């Protein structure tokens, strides 16, 4: 019986996927056995960033060079990532959480159900308040939508109440959360969601979750 949960993290370039994983691992690595697999087209830049900045030892972080469309590597042909998962589990049989970060992609990114048990999709306020209502599978079908960089709203003319209204409509009852990862704002809500809906802990919904 498999004992670990695979969490897929996707979203456009620069939205905060790597930052989210870095902040999460800092907070939860003391409670759970965690590993990370990153995807980049031609480099291992995200893996190198996490190695330098997260609290995880380097052997718990693995970079996959997809050499092509990042969407394909997490959906149509996830074989490289599945092999990376197998290797990570062989290294750490006690692992409980494996984060799999997609390379930067558009709003249509989705994970193969063989690769991810639950999915988090990250967008950011700097892309404009219209982003939630543009839809796409990442926004409408992910298990959790993270709307990051709330601190930038005044500088880009984004109304967070409009983004909340549109996200409610597009998500149709599925949870989402606003974050400012630079200051760890609502990071505890993301952790609470992971514990309740990925690890199936018997806890209350985090107060910062919106439906």
Curated annotation (Swiss-Prot):
InterPro entries documented for this protein: CobW/HypB/UreG_nucleotide-bd, P-loop_NTPase, UreG
GO molecular function: GTP binding; GTPase activity; nickel cation binding
Signal peptide: none
GO biological process: urea catabolic process
Chain sites annotated for binding GTP: 11-18
One Pfam family in the UniProt entry: cobW
Keywords on record: Chaperone, Cytoplasm, GTP-binding, Nickel insertion, Nucleotide-binding
GO cellular component, as recorded: cytoplasm
CDD domains: UreG
Compartments, record wording: Cytoplasm
Gene3D superfamilies the record matches: P-loop containing nucleotide triphosphate hydrolases (3.40.50.300)
Broad class of where this protein is predominantly found: cytoplasm
PANTHER family: UREASE ACCESSORY PROTEIN G
Listed NCBIfam families: ureG
Entry's family note: Belongs to the SIMIBI class G3E GTPase family. UreG subfamily.
Function noted in UniProt: Facilitates the functional incorporation of the urease nickel metallocenter. This process requires GTP hydrolysis, probably effectuated by UreG.
Subunit structure: Homodimer. UreD, UreF and UreG form a complex that acts as a GTP-hydrolysis-dependent molecular chaperone, activating the urease apoprotein by helping to assemble the nickel containing metallocenter of UreC. The UreE protein probably delivers the nickel.
Protein name per UniProt: Urease accessory protein UreG
Organism: Actinobacillus pleuropneumoniae serotype 3 (strain JL03)
Lineage of source species: Bacteria, Pseudomonadati, Pseudomonadota, Gammaproteobacteria, Pasteurellales
Gene (name only): ureG
């Amino acid at each position: 019986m498999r004992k670990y949960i695979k969490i897929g993290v996707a979203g456009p370039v620069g939205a905060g996927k790597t930052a989210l994983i870095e902040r999460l691992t800092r907070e939860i690595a003391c409670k759970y056995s965690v590993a990370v697999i990153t995807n980049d087209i031609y480099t291992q830049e995200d893996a190198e960033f996490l190695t330098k900045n997260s609290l995880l030892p380097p052997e718990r972080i693995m970079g996959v060079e997809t050499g092509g469309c990042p969407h394909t590597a997490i959906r149509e042909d996830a074989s490289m990532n599945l092999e990376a998962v197998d290797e990570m589990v062989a290294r750490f049989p006690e692992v409980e959480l494996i984060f799999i970060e997609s390379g930067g992609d558009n709003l249509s990114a989705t994970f193969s159900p063989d690769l991810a048990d639950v999915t988090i999709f990250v967008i950011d306020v700097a892309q404009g308040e219209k982003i939630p209502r543009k839809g796409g599978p990442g926004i409408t079908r992910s298990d959790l939508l993270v709307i990051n960089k709330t601190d930038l709203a005044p500088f880009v003319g984004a109304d967070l109440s409009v983004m909340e209204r549109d996200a409610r409509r597009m998500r149709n009852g599925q949870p989402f959360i606003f974050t400012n990862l630079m200051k760890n704002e609502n990071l505890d809500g993301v952790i609470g969601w992971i514990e309740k809906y990925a690890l199936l802990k018997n806890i209350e919904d985090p107060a910062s979750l919106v439906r």
